[in-house]
Amino acid sequence: MQIERIRIDKATFDMRDFAKHPTGFSLVYEPGSRKSVSAYAVRIYTDEGVVGEYVGGNSIAAAQVDMFGRYLIGKDPFQRERIYNDVKRQLRKFDKMGMGLIDIPLWDLAGRAFGVPVRTLLGGWKTRLPAYASTAAGDRSGGLDSAAAYADFAVQCKELGYRAYKLHVWDDYDVPEVVRTIAAVRDAVGPDMDLMLDPGCKLETFAHAVQVGRACDDAGYLWLEDPYKDTGVSLQGHRRLRELIRTPLLQTEHVRGLEQHIDFAVGGGTDFVRADAEYDGGITGALKIAYATEGLGLDVELHTPGPAQRQLMASIRNTNYYEMSFVHPKSAEIGRSQAVYADGYRDGLTAIGADGCVPVPDGPGLGVSYDWDAIEAHTVETREYR
């Protein structure tokens, strides 16, 4: 089997009631606003008629595919390891995000060729995954605008069945307000719900990170993630922070690549390791990170929701929660369009069962069917490689 053609459609969809924060870059709740979001729909065609599909990515990843798209033509689509290493070298001067946009549909293609879900190819066994509610950033527009609002939403999520809840705080934060919020959420849900905090690298100083971390200590949080404006990449800074607080750190969302992830973990910069199938070389790259992390005796936590993440998590032992990201008490938006699916697959606040879990799609490949009519109706740009 050989790759004959690759097509990437850029489709745009409206995201309602969200806008960029005026003093930062977070998407925050703003009633009446509309924000255009893009999705990159990839199809990899072969000479035997098998097609691999995936919708996701970002503009940086799509631009990088231009650097290796034609190299893929004529290649065996099952030789993912060869493709991974060749493309990794080609993108060595860049962040390598383009790798994931091609690797994921190659796994979908393999699953479709053999008539099994990706998790079966990976030796996976899980059929349901425990999820955590990962909030949108804090706003000042009547949504997540106070400690009480975060606490009330945590209770709502617990009642829906979520076993864990992660806060993303305000761009215009105040340390005492963040500290109050950390405590208020714990007081509201009690001791039997895992809680996490992700400031999204917003805290201005290391001192603020220490103050917030010690509040997490007092409230018994499971982890603190990407606290301050080093942007999550300072091994020395996070190693020192680990020495000053008890709450485990979850880092490496903003560190690219297998070797860099493991250097960060071995160097003592984190307790949990973050991996992302889109950011870290696709399913192939994220799986390498998961296995290497397992060899260190640590857990890996996958970033963001989606069918690729579900197939991957179903195949990894050393992982805890599926991230149901961008949930909000007054919106069904999750930061990416759900209109791309044709088969009822969805992510979002109410996408979990009463057991607090999401199902792993059991169809071939990624296990989902895309609505290509809807995608093409929203397409604004197409690239092809032959």
Question: Residues of each region from the PLM?
Answer:
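Motif-centric detector for short Cys/His coordination patterns
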Residues: 1-41, 57-62, 69-77
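Flexible C-terminal active-site loop/helix
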Residues: 2-11, 15-18, 29-31, 37, ...
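Metal- or metallocofactor-binding catalytic centers and their adjacent structured scaffolds
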Residues: 5, 45-114
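Shared catalytic-loop signature of beta/alpha-barrel
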Residues: 22-23, 79, 214, 220, ...
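Ligand-binding pocket scaffold of soluble enzyme catalytic domains
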Residues: 36-38, 42, 47-51, 113-116, ...
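Glycine-rich, aromatic-flanked loop segments that form ligand/cofactor-binding clefts
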Residues: 103-143
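Metal-dependent enolase-superfamily TIM-barrel catalytic cores that perform enediolate-based chemistry
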Residues: 128-245
